[in-house]
Curated annotation (Swiss-Prot):
Gene that encodes it: gloB
CDD domains: hydroxyacylglutathione_hydrolase_MBL-fold (cd07723)
Keyword annotations: Hydrolase, Metal-binding, Zinc
Keyword Hydrolase: yes
Naturally occurring in which organism (per UniProt): Prochlorococcus marinus (strain MIT 9313)
Similarity-based family: Belongs to the metallo-beta-lactamase superfamily. Glyoxalase II family.
Gene Ontology MF terms: hydroxyacylglutathione hydrolase activity; metal ion binding
Stated name of the protein: Hydroxyacylglutathione hydrolase
Amino acid sequence: MEATSTAATSDKQRSSIHALPVLQDNIIWIWIKGNQAVVVDPAIAEPVKTWLRTRKLSLAAVLQTHHHADHIGGTLELLRDWPNAAVVAAAEDRDRIPFQTISVRDRDKVSLLNSSVEVLAVAGHTRAHIAYYLPTNKEDLEDPAVFCGDTLFGAGCGRLFEGTAEDMFKALQRLSCLPAKTRVYCAHEYTEANLRWASALHPEDVAISERLADVSSRRQRGALSLPSSISEEQRTNLFVRAQSSKELAELRHHKDQWRN
């Protein structure tokens, strides 16, 4: 199962972003341009190695959004095969991602595949969680893109393992301020379950009901629900729609207790 968002795959010098589903619900995103690839949050290595070698691609860099094992578990093995690949991660997480080679902080910019990638601090799920934003480049990506790890999900957000509701509220508000057409590349396929929860809370909400029907149909066909867009999350994501950190905390508590 593979989903692709691309500007122009017929032109090998333009970027394309591909999904590699692994484990139960992880999605490893692979951004390619020419014969180079950037891999985001590789939970495990073997499927990534196979995917890259089949396409005769070289690993240029790994982007790490946070330190959890299902996001960094495959990185060291990938580095054994591509020892010159960079590993970009939060400087604040140097103790938990010690193999990082490019340590970044909020608003830093990193040049990858001849594009400028902006780092966004989005604490909440973990204290040092970051996202990576690729602005629009009409000669490359048609739409902006954000790799947001476990901060923003399709119709949901990450659990608050280290941060507070205030942290998450600020992180989601920040992501929500990105251009509406920004493509959202999160790290887990949770969209359908999140929408079922949202629909149970707001059965009268037409936008949520319509998105749930669309996502359920896609999943039944074996397709992914992702990437989504910032505008779609603004319409149908209750956490993004929250008006305060207090409201977000109440929603997060309710979702944590909810069983489909």
